[in-house]
Design a protein with these regions (language model features):
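Short beta-strand-to-loop acidic/aromatic patch adjacent to the donor-nucleotide binding site
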Residues: 115-127
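A conserved acidic beta->alpha catalytic loop
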Residues: 38-71
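Short, acidic, metal-binding catalytic loop of nucleotide-sugar glycosyltransferases
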Residues: 21-31, 54-56
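Non-catalytic, C-terminal membrane-associated alpha-helical segments of glycosyltransferases
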Residues: 268, 273, 285-340
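Acidic/His-rich active-site region of diverse nucleotide-sugar glycosyltransferases
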Residues: 52-57, 84, 92-95, 127, ...
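A short, conserved alpha-helix in the catalytic core of glycosyltransferases
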Residues: 197-216, 220-247
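Glycine-rich, basic loop-to-helix element that forms the pyrophosphate-binding segment
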Residues: 70-76, 85, 92-111
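Short, well-formed alpha-helical segments that are part of the catalytic scaffolds
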Residues: 12-25, 47
């Protein structure tokens, strides 16, 4: 069984390089092919291609349409291996489609291909342990789960859990990172399976059958909360679980500036977090939208309390956009790209 490993990049060739090197050490019992998509435009795609060449990957002749990509290239390692991503494909998105849009480009192209029995969605700023994929596949098969997540640890504190998945908290209107700061060597708590609403979007596995059942990721979020919605859909339709032996080290926020500190976060991450919380609730729990709107607005003032007026403004703008029902790419941050 071969897995399609999908990585969405945005002008981060060095992150992708380190991720590929970690993947090169993967367990040979879980073969996979790597499918990259560059959301950052032609210059970023050229930098990605240059990085692949510098890593010793050899371009292979490719015949056929590039659609739905603007450009498409195929590479292979000098020595074909059953694991470590012997086949590497790199596609240029026609525009910046966001996280789900990038994932879905490859899912649409790969879904008809019977070679792939599952899909591993992985962030570029991650370093998976050698057995991370094997553990995901094993857990999916053991329990008949359609979607399985990894446990994440940070690069700075690998001995502590960053998250073992997400749980939506309707009263405070935000997701909880499950078992955050718990020692990584400790097993998950007995209640985690019931509390789990979604995996971390940085590393999770989806079976071919699950994709047929729940469909692709919802692209209207652009960034943030699309993984939470997909997880809830999987939980209801085909089963959701954590693979506790699948460990992935994660930088977090490398592309969007999603630092955990309110003052350090980028305006983009703050804006989308507040906009998309309302969008998520409108789609999944519409009856709770009035309460969510009040809570999210009230919490914007926390940015003023920590001396971050710029992020307070971004939060209020995001909240207002969410209240108006705005979705997709926020042109106030990306409008200059469309003009190129």
């Amino acid at each position: 069984m071969t897995t399609a490993l999908i990585i969405v990049a945005y002008r981060a060739p060095e992150d992708v390089r380190q991720c590929l090197r970690a993947l090169g050490q993967s367990d040979s019992g879980a073969p996979f092919d790597i499918f990259l998509v560059e959301n950052g435009g032609p210059d970023a795609y050229a930098a990605l291609i240059a990085m692949l060449a510098a890593e010793g990957l050899i371009p292979k002749n490719f015949r056929g349409p590039a659609a739905p990509f603007h450009r498409l290239a195929r590479y292979a390692r000098e020595t074909e291996r059953p694991a470590g991503g012997a086949r590497v494909w790199a596609g240029l998105a026609p525009e910046n489609l966001g996280y789900a849009g990038g994932v879905n480009l490859w899912l649409r192209r790969l879904a008809p291909n019977p070679r792939y029995e599952g899909y591993w969605i992985l962030n570029p700023d991650t370093l998976p342990e050698p057995d991370a994929l094997a553990a995901l596949i094993e857990e999916a098969a053991r329990g008949g789960f359609g979607m399985v997540g990894s446990q994440l640890v940070s690069l700075a504190r690998p001995e502590r859990i960053a998250t073992r998945g997400q749980r939506w908290r309707p009263l405070v209107c935000r997701p909880l990172a499950l078992e955050r700061a718990k020692p990584a060597r400790e097993r998950p708590g007995a209640r985690l399976a019931a509390r789990l609403d979604a995996p971390s979007g940085a590393s999770f596995y989806l079976t071919r059958m699950a994709l047929q059942q729940i469909g692709p990721m919802e692209e209207s979020y652009f960034l943030y909360y699309e993984d939470l919605e997909w997880g809830l859909r999987a939980k209801a339709a085909c089963g959701l679980a954590l693979a506790e032996k699948s460990t992935v080290r994660h930088v977090g926020g490398a592309t969007t500036g999603a630092s955990p500190g309110r003052r350090a976060r980028s305006a983009l991450s703050v804006y989308l977090d507040h906009r998309n919380r309302l969008h998520f609730v409108r789609r999944m729990f519409p009856g709770r939208l009035p309460w969510t709107a009040l809570v999210v607005l009230a919490r914007t003032f926390e940015f003023l309390a920590v001396g971050a007026p710029g992020n307070f403004k971004a939060a209020v703008l995001g909240w207002a956009a969410g209240l108006r029902g705005e979705t997709g790419r926020p042109e106030r941050f990306y409008g200059h790209e469309a003009a190129r």
